[in-house]
């Protein structure tokens, strides 16, 4: 059985845009943009305490916050800009594909239901 493309590929594009939007949203929610402290051997990204002979490091341990609230609290302008831009592009793409499908599937007036 040979593989054939779908007769209307717009549904495929709509799902791809939605999936890309979800991937971008997941990336923003999961990524950690907090500053890292310590050296390459003693990394304390969330605060804490380390003692070793002559070396003693103690950083404040922050309460566990959701990474989105940390991102917004730090106001990383690039992250916020990309999130808003991705949302706008996703909504525009969904609107475009929905309008195209509606026009191509029905050749009658939306207001009066007559063909013109």
UniProtKB/Swiss-Prot annotation:
Keywords: Host endoplasmic reticulum, Host membrane, Membrane, Transmembrane, Transmembrane helix, Transport, Viral movement protein. The chain crosses the membrane at residues 12-32, 78-98. The keyword Oxidoreductase does not apply. Residues 33-77 are lumenal. Its main location: host cell. It holds the Pfam family Plant_vir_prot. Residues 1-11, 99-116 are cytoplasmic. One of its GO terms (biological process) is transport of virus in host, cell to cell. It is found in: Host endoplasmic reticulum membrane. GO terms for cellular component: host cell endoplasmic reticulum membrane; membrane. The keyword Acyltransferase does not apply. Belongs to the Tymovirales TGBp2 protein family. Plays a role in viral cell-to-cell propagation, by facilitating genome transport to neighboring plant cells through plasmosdesmata,. TGBp1, TGBp2 and TGBp3 seem to act together for cell-to-cell propagation. TGBp1 is the main movement protein that physically cross the plasmodesma with the viral genome. TGBp2 and TGBp3 would facilitate TGBp1 function. This is Movement protein TGB2. It comes from White clover mosaic virus (strain M).
């Amino acid at each position: 059985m040979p593989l054939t493309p779908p007769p209307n590929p717009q549904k495929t594009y709509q799902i791809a845009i939605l999936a890309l939007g979800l991937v971008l949203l997941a990336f923003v929610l999961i990524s950690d943009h907090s500053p890292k402290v310590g050296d390459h051997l003693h990394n304390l990204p969330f605060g804490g305490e380390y003692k070793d002979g002559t070396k003693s490091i103690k950083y404040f341990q922050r309460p566990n916050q959701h990474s989105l609230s940390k991102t917004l609290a730090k106001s990383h302008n690039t992250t916020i800009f990309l999130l808003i831009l991705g949302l706008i592009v996703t909504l525009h793409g969904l609107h475009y594909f929905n309008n195209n499908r509606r026009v191509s599937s029905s050749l009658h007036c939306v207001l009066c239901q007559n063909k013109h």
